Design a protein with these regions (language model features):
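Phosphoinositide-dependent membrane-docking surfaces
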Residues: 37-48
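Anionic N-terminal interaction surfaces
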Residues: 1-20
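Short, surface-exposed polybasic-and-hydrophobic patches located at secondary-structure transitions
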Residues: 51-72
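A short, compositionally biased
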Residues: 19-23, 48-52
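Short aromatic-glycine motifs in intrinsically disordered, low-complexity regions
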Residues: 22-36
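Helix-rich interaction surfaces within compact, conserved domain-sized segments
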Residues: 65-108
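Acidic surface patches and DE-rich sequence motifs
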Residues: 29, 48, 58
């Protein structure tokens, strides 16, 4: 039987993301940009297994996380067990941000 102490000290699932219970989740992109969003501001999330890719949509754009452990990150994320994520080249291969286009920037 697992004790409460053991639950609090379980090993990290990956070095690519930081465990914790956040109010703000931080995404560090491949380009070095850092985006922070309130955890509950997520509009939509989808994991696509055939591409090992997770899409997290926020008001300003979509965070795209790719890699063999993207689904495990998603599982931790939805349980509020992840504070930040960045590519480590092994478990998470890429973290990118696709910003929403502003109305005035759209080409007609």
């Amino acid at each position: 039987m697992t004790t409460l102490r053991e639950l609090g000290t379980r090993p990290r699932r990956s070095q690519a993301w930081e465990p914790g219970s956040p109010e703000i989740v931080r995404f560090i992109t491949d380009e070095g940009a850092s985006y922070g969003f309130l955890w509950h501001a997520l509009i939509f999330g989808a994991y696509v297994p055939e591409h090992e890719t997770l899409f997290l949509q926020y008001g300003t754009g979509t965070v795209i996380i790719a890699g063999p452990k993207a689904e495990e990150f998603w599982e931790d994320f939805i349980q509020r067990k992840a504070i930040s994520v960045k590519a480590d080249g092994v478990d998470i291969l890429s973290v990118t941000m696709s910003l929403r286009q502003r109305k005035e920037d759209k080409v007609e």
